[in-house]
Amino acid sequence: MDWGTLHTFIGGVNKHSTSIGKVWITVIFIFRVMILVVAAQEVWGDEQEDFVCNTLQPGCKNVCYDHFFPVSHIRLWALQLIFVSTPALLVAMHVAYYRHETTRKFRRGEKRNDFKDIEDIKKQKVRIEGSLWWTYTSSIFFRIIFEAAFMYVFYFLYNGYHLPWVLKCGIDPCPNLVDCFISRPTEKTVFTIFMISASVICMLLNVAELCYLLLKVCFRRSKRAQTQKNHPNHALKESKQNEMNELISDSGQNAITGFPS
């Protein structure tokens, strides 16, 4: 897996994220990706080779290992990072579409007063509002779901987050109940708890960011309603102006198509 590509991809979304979102991206790469690349492969590099059972029955060791570890910790963590990072693709695609439309309008002369050139459009920080707000909040919601789902999968597959010193296995073709031992169980337990804790922190950051965006929208709407309440004439004038613009637009379209309004 090319983690550099993942860093470049999510780093591009970082430009349009909130402050909490930037902290989330930092936690993802420092406490999860870097730890997974640097340390996890060393800790779990001897998984099946150093899994020992006190029997010489052919196939017993492999069957017991597959029973207790159906999926490798490293592969499951890597899959979790991919799923958690994928919703950022929604935001990246939305921003790319917005820039494409803005560039098209700029070339048609509709955005000449807003931007100097096309490079200025590319450097613009897109505000999280309108349709982008829905896309951004949806991506956060999916990240929360994926984090919680993978934490449950970890607990379900391994019967908790603690790796025992001795595993009792009585699955065929084992002749009887045999004892199996894994390498460095304490170190792997500490590492597992650390990765789960990082997942919890990321999930809490996602919840905090989602609450922040919801409160921000509520505050903005409350402020807008208060403004309309304090200046009803201005709001009425603005409403009439919008209706007049719609009538003018409809009249223009009817004149072009040749149908009466």
Curated annotation (Swiss-Prot):
Keywords: Cell junction, Cell membrane, Deafness, Disease variant, Ectodermal dysplasia, Gap junction, Hearing, Membrane, Non-syndromic deafness, Palmoplantar keratoderma, Transmembrane, Transmembrane helix. The keyword Cell membrane applies. SMART domains: CNX, Connexin_CCC. It is a multi-pass membrane protein. The chain crosses the membrane at residues 23-45, 76-98, 132-154, 193-215. Residues 46-75, 155-192 are extracellular. It is found in: Cell membrane; Cell junction, Gap junction. InterPro entries: Connexin, Connexin_CCC, Connexin_CS, Connexin_N, Connexin_N_sf. GO terms for molecular function: actin filament binding; beta-tubulin binding; gap junction channel activity; gap junction channel activity involved in cell communication by electrical coupling; microtubule binding. Residues 1-22, 99-131, 216-261 are cytoplasmic. One of its GO terms (biological process) is response to lipopolysaccharide. Changing G59R: Found in one patient with a syndrome resembling Vohwinkel and Bart-Pumphrey syndromes. One gap junction consists of a cluster of closely packed pairs of transmembrane channels, the connexons, through which materials of low MW diffuse from one cell to a neighboring cell. Belongs to the connexin family. Beta-type (group I) subfamily. A connexon is composed of a hexamer of connexins. Interacts with CNST. This is Gap junction beta-6 protein. It comes from Homo sapiens.
